[in-house]
Amino acid sequence: MYTPRQSLYIRGSAGDPLPPVWAALDQKGTHLRRGQLVLVCAGPGTGKSAFVLAYALKSKVPTLYFSADSDAFTQLSRSVSILSGWSLERATRAVREQNIEDAVADSLDEIPIRFNYKASPSLDEIENALAAYDALYEDFPALIVVDNITNVRTDSSEGDDPFSGLESLMDYLHEMGRETGSCVVGLHHVTGPHNDGDKPIPLSGIKGQIGRVPEMILTLHRVSDGFGPDMLNVSTVKNRGGKSDPSGQDFASLEFVGDTMQINDFGH
């Protein structure tokens, strides 16, 4: 048990914000913080994986990325495109031919990110990867990404409800953030009516209604007018440390060029 003053000294890095990447999110008071659990939810093809990967690459914080949903070829192609501005077609061709230009390869080498590509990692495999990271770097990463949480094997036996295991997984990831001091980001799906991904998604749109535990929940929707870049809108529908709007109607807008995987502030 700790007094309030003792809590000040034992918190470690918990609560420290990770570097902002997009001013639009920063101005909304949406900050990823160490020691906390964040859920990023969107329909298929909206760009949630691109959004989180772009954050990890551009923030340049030490990251352990559990890429269950995408293989090494896909993630490397995306990373090359994000960092170089190349089209995804050019990036995938360069990766396939193992012919990445030196300047791009050097920029990849500068990013302190490590990937785990287990398609259905168990909790033991996640813990082993974290232990290996700690043994290698003598510290835990600032950011841990689980993409996505439905791929994690929880071996839950709580009846026939497929989301009972996700609720316990949220508790597990929450505790992971507390114990490691890492910001843990989980990617997740939304309910059927919101799968089109072209309208604001409220807190109630999260698949399985597992929003009890995370400190922050972001929902993404994407709007295209058929000309120029798309608009990737980020709604902060839950935020224990700041402003939120559970309806999803208040959002930060980012410019998203899908062909080159570029996500930027408008007018950057």
Swiss-Prot record:
Keywords assigned by UniProt, alphabetized: ATP-binding, Nucleotide-binding
Domain of life: Viruses
GO MF annotation, one: ATP binding
Nucleotide-binding listed as a keyword: yes
Claim: Nucleotide-binding is one of the keywords in the record: yes
UniProt GO BP: DNA replication
Protein name from the UniProt record: Gene 65 protein
